[in-house]
Structures are given as structure tokens and as C-alpha cells.
Amino acid sequence: MKTHHLKIWPQWFDAIRLGSKSYEIRYDDRGFNVGDRLVLEEFKAGVGEYTGRTIEKRVVYISRGDDAEAFGGLREGYAVLGIGPCA
């Protein structure tokens, strides 16, 4: 299992924090695997700075754009990461 530190914009950070968003769509350049820990670090892109707020989640499911089972519309090289609480 790996730990991945990822920037996340405020609107997506809050949706995950409030429980209304349970996935992340990411460029799959890190070798994500089920069981990996994500440290989501809130980042204000327009200002170019971190806010200091973080959320930790666990990858519970992965659908990759280059998998035969992946739904149409997901670009090759990207992945949908189903995320859940860290145990």
C-alpha cells in the first residue's frame, strides 16, 4: 500500500468532507491500487497555495480508462477512484 498526497480544489474538498462525493477522477500516473491511502490537500488553484486542510481516504475501487470493462467516455490514462474512510 502506498500513500499519495494529492492537491484538491476547495469545491471538491468540501464535497468529500460533507460525504456527497465518494470518488476522485485522476490521471493514473501514480500506480494507484485498492487499499492505497489518499491524503487530499485542499489547494486554491487561482492563488496557488494550500489552505492547510487535509482529508485522508482509502481507495476501495478503481476503474481505469484503458481497461476493457471501463465505461465509455473515460479517457485512456485516467482512473476513477472509489474512496472510503481510512480504517
Positions of predicted regions on the chain:
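Short, charged beta-turn/beta-strand-edge "cap" motif at the junction between a beta-strand
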Residues: 28-29, 43-48
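Glycine- and charge-enriched low-complexity intrinsically disordered segments
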Residues: 62-87
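Short beta-strand-centered aromatic/proline hotspots
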Residues: 47-63
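Compositionally biased, charged N-terminal/linker segments
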Residues: 1-26
